[in-house]
């Protein structure tokens, strides 16, 4: 109860932001309609995607979360206020996880920094995947840490960590590929090092994959493709591969550009028109092939797009055909500080790798796999939020245990 009271000011700030935002946006805004529509489809037919070409655009995780609200006919503000409760629960998770490595005071400082991070506040009032992903990431970090620190309940925390990672993949399908990469990595690590910590991490990823099997099987019956997560990946990779000098790999149109023409995508108009009548899976495959061709033909331009994309992931800039505006500072200033801090912490992380607790290394690696995957897809600042709590765990540990606060000298072990 004391922890909840100490987090109450942060919770009140979150609630006020959501209430004020909802007063100005009582209806659905860009990005929300897709998830609400999916939730209604799940409620009415048990299917996320309906119609003549029922291939989901995104994972079912967040629409499933919205289903109870739609059953109860909850207004939009109620569904948005749920985000404040998700962040409160996530903060409780994170406080308990960080207490193993820092004092209570610094654990609260870290959690408040996360909760007041401007990008978190920007997307908090919206019915999109990021708030629930923050909660799930906090839960994943907590259970992976307790899996090592609480031997008496190790099996419980192992299973729960797997469930949280699995639901993260259902909410943000990129985590599906993170799971696949992590399975291979931890399997090799377990075979080479023969350490139980690596074996436990492997079991977590296998449980996470098992959580996703029903969804993957349903997609397989629709598409004939194993391990097919959603149809958005091809378009994202296509924009990232753009060979035109004025473009930086960002998303130039709405989610379905073949349904209409946008001036930003004028250079892509002919190719986009050729996709209009294709089935979803064939369209996705065509986009992927064209993206790969662009990358092979213009590797230097793709490298430039990649640098711009990583920068955009942290500071929400640059964008194609768009100049800077004062409002961009909301993301650029804190994002630049976060990016610099992460780059500075890479050095002590590498230097002290063997002395960093296994559970912190594992949380860091999952976040690293996700960021690496997002770096080759068209990215924005909101896409960093699903691993932001894991980054907080990593940064807090590194700053507390490998850097001397008085003079910032590294401690090498």
Give the role of each language-model region:
Residues 94-116, 134-135, 153-156, 358-361:
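Transmembrane-helix signature of polytopic, membrane-embedded enzymes
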Residues 81-102, 116, 139, 341-344:
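Transmembrane-helix motifs of polytopic, lipid-linked glycan transferases
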Residues 30, 57, 78-86, 109-144, ...:
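Multi-pass, polyprenyl lipid-linked donor-dependent membrane glycosyltransferases
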Residues 75-78, 83, 286-287, 293-364:
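Membrane-interface anchor segments at the N-terminal boundary of transmembrane helices
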Residues 24-38, 48, 53-65, 74-77, ...:
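Extracytoplasmic catalytic/substrate-binding loops of multi-pass membrane glycan-assembly enzymes
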Residues 56, 60-67, 72-92, 123, ...:
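Loop-to-helix entry region of an early transmembrane alpha helix in multi-pass inner-membrane enzymes
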Residues 228-308:
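Membrane-proximal stem/loop segments at transmembrane-domain junctions that anchor or position
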Residues 102-104, 140-160, 168, 189-192, ...:
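Membrane-interface transmembrane helices that cradle and orient dolichyl/undecaprenyl
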